[in-house]
Structures are given as structure tokens and as C-alpha cells.
């Protein structure tokens, strides 16, 4: 894989095909992250770009609203905000320039609330 032309010399990120579509295997630096969340390990069989855990079972509706505002501030438009679904989760679908698509799922599980991000392959790497 070719090296990035950035000053850091970091390698270009990898991508994965999913049932949702092709995604980056990570999110770019500075991608909105809910305050107080921490990076979480793999929480399911479907690949995602990032997973964060909010301790204390953060309110999924509040987290979804915060993520929507943060992505809109970052110039992404909201395509849909669905929820609460039967399991208490919310799904935020956002779009950007050049066919960029982002999906953020917020799901309560036990004493944690997980935020998973699918960062579409058409989105800028960073």
C-alpha cells in the first residue's frame, strides 16, 4: 500500500466491504466523539470504522442528538435519524460531499452505551 504524502508519512488507511457498503477501517483524527466516551473493542460480527463506549449508560437520545449536531458542525448533512428502535437504539445517517456517507449507531447494552461508526469509503481519509 502506498504511503501518504502527508508530513507524518503515515500509510493510507485500509478499507473493508460490509453489508452497509465499503468503509474505512478507522475514522480520521478529529472525528466527533461523544464527551466521556472511550475506545471500545469489537462489539459485533459486522466490521465498523470505530466503536466507543459511554460508561454509566449514557442516554442514547442525548448522544444521538449530540452526534447529529457535531456532524452538522463538521459540514455533514443529516439524511435520517431513526429511533428509538425496539432495543432503545438510534441510527444517524449523514452525508457529505462526493458521495461520503456516515452511519452512527447508538445502542444501550447493560451499563454502557455503545456508539459505532461506519465511515464510508467515499469520505475523506483525514
Give residue ranges: language-model regions:
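An acidic-aromatic pocket/loop used at catalytic or ligand-binding sites
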Residues: 1-126
Amino acid at each position: 500500500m502506498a504511503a501518504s504524502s502527508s508530513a507524518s508519512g503515515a500509510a493510507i488507511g485500509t478499507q473493508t466491504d460490509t453489508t452497509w457498503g465499503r468503509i474505512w477501517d478507522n475514522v480520521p483524527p478529529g472525528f466527533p466523539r461523544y464527551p466521556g466516551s472511550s475506545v471500545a473493542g469489537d462489539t459485533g460480527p459486522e466490521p465498523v470504522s470505530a466503536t466507543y463506549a459511554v460508561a454509566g449508560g449514557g442516554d442514547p437520545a442525548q448522544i444521538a442528538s449530540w452526534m447529529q449536531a457535531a456532524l452538522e458542525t463538521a459540514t455533514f448533512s443529516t439524511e435520517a435519524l431513526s429511533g428509538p428502535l425496539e432495543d432503545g437504539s438510534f441510527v444517524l445517517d449523514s452525508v457529505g460531499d462526493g458521495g461520503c456517507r456516515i452511519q452512527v449507531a447508538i445502542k444501550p447494552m447493560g451499563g454502557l452505551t455503545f456508539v459505532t461508526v461506519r465511515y464510508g469509503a467515499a469520505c475523506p481519509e483525514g
